[in-house]
Amino acid sequence: MIIVLSPAKSLDYETPPHVSHHTQPQFADDAAALIDELRRLSPQQIGTLMSISDPLARLNFQRYADWSRASTPANAKQAVLAFNGDVYEGLDARSLSPDDLDYAQRHVRVLSGLYGLLRPLDLLQPYRLEMGTRFSNARGKDLYAFWGERITHALNAELKTRVGASRVLVNCASAEYFKSVKPKLLDARVVTPVFEDWKDGRYKIISFHAKRARGLMARYVVEGRIDSPDALKDFASEGYAFDASASNDDTYVFRRRAGA
């Protein structure tokens, strides 16, 4: 079983990693090709492309200039420890043991606009490039065209090593990022957990809580060494509970009445 997550825009390069083990991104050459094209943009063009402020545009202009094809602990950090958004607060990888991180390395993947597909311990250099960015490039009109079927083929290569009920992709990524995967080409069942909170008289998806819950689900999978979709139904972190009546074979709905 493999669980896929979205990345985060917020990054932490201040906190030293608590593990030294690291790996190299599979699609580093593709990332370098994108960086070469991004370096042609001015800060103003970056700001317009990404709809970000002038200071953020200048920051990312400098990040692209500083980016190196060679990722080392001196210029990069393990992805799961560098990402710092809501999903990663739920995952809280900094508190995972080395054994937990080793399991995550085999079962967790992060979709990325720049890197395509990352393992938790792949070295990540600072960047910002959301998958939905309409960045025209040598391969097409946007990043979905750039990545094409590459991410899907990479996931299939890993899923083929899993047997039986464990040949499952758990989609804990956003719609923007999961669009880079071609489910019809996947040699696996896809299960999507959905997290809803009670508000204004009904259950609804609240973005902040849903993002955090995706990270909590990934942590549950890692700590529990979960390798079958049925075991996902026992997830009960921070008040969530599986609701069979709202779920089906492909979508597992978890609900809670009050905030954690």
From Swiss-Prot:
Cystine crosslinks: none
Leader sequence segment: none
InterPro entries named among the record's database cross-references: YaaA
UniProt cross-references to Pfam families, sorted A to Z: H2O2_YaaD (PF03883)
BP terms from Gene Ontology: response to hydroperoxide
GO cellular component: cytosol
Family statement: Belongs to the UPF0246 family.
NCBIfam families, sorted: PRK02101.1-1 (NF002541), PRK02101.1-3 (NF002542)
Protein name per Swiss-Prot or TrEMBL: UPF0246 protein BURPS668_1321
